[in-house]
Amino acid sequence: MLAASFSGPVVHEVAQADPQLATPQHKVRFAVCGMSHDHIYGMVGAIQRGGGELVLAQATEPDKVAAFKKRFPDVRWAANEEEVLHDSSIQLVLSSKIASERAPLGVRVMRSGKDFLSDKPGITTLEQLAEVRKAIAETKRIYGIMYSERLEVKAAVKAGELIHAGAIGRVIQTINIAPHQIHQGAGDWGGASGRPDWFWNDTQYGGILCDIGSHQVDQFLYYTRSTQAEVVASQIANVAHKDHPHF
């Protein structure tokens, strides 16, 4: 980040992240509907830390279901999506389905009277964006997207706090370099296996700028306190994976 108030020598300091709230301030009953990406574990953890109670889960991939059951052995399982949507006791639905399927699910969730939290990218086409905006306007429900790089990384959270407190002056430029491994390491925000077939298809995962670049756009807007942005140039290339022409 480049700030507009540099003066004097640079002083190296360690900024401590604020401790997490010991007691959640809110309570919410939530469900998981679709877990194609392992980001779902970090999403569940974030909601639980905020006072959420995981009461229901639904997914179709056997390996993902087995892993989730091992992590959350007491959760109740729904037979299908409709069971989740028709459960009036649920206030919020989380999903890390295949990226192109998240927005349509979110629209159905909102129209069932529930709020929705999607893994990123939460929307993959302009047509989906229009449908989501329409559903929000008509239902007054929340369509949230978990941008974990800003919301779950302690350094990023602290950076936001310092910026908004005026500690480094006005941010006038942001630069972000975000390499992404093909085979991700273990962890709630990464995943412990290679990319599934859908992750090589740009119509399903949204393309690299939508998938990864959405993180950076979110951060650029937040750190500069902007509400609008214009993309003036972009470039992509498939350098090392010619066997996946739609990557």
Q: What spans do the regions from the language model cover?
A:
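Beta-strand-loop-alpha-helix segment that lines the small-molecule cofactor/substrate pocket
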Residues: 92, 98, 103-151, 166
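N-terminal Rossmann-like dinucleotide-binding module
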Residues: 2-72, 192
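Short loop/edge segments at beta-strand edges and connector loops
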Residues: 79, 118, 145-147, 233-236
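Short acidic low-complexity segments
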Residues: 76-86
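Short, Asp-centered acidic motifs that coordinate Mg2+ and/or phosphate
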Residues: 56, 91-92, 144, 173
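Predominantly a Rossmann-like dinucleotide-binding segment in NAD(P)-dependent oxidoreductases
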Residues: 38, 142, 151-244
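Short, conserved SAM-binding/catalytic segment
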Residues: 68-75, 132-136
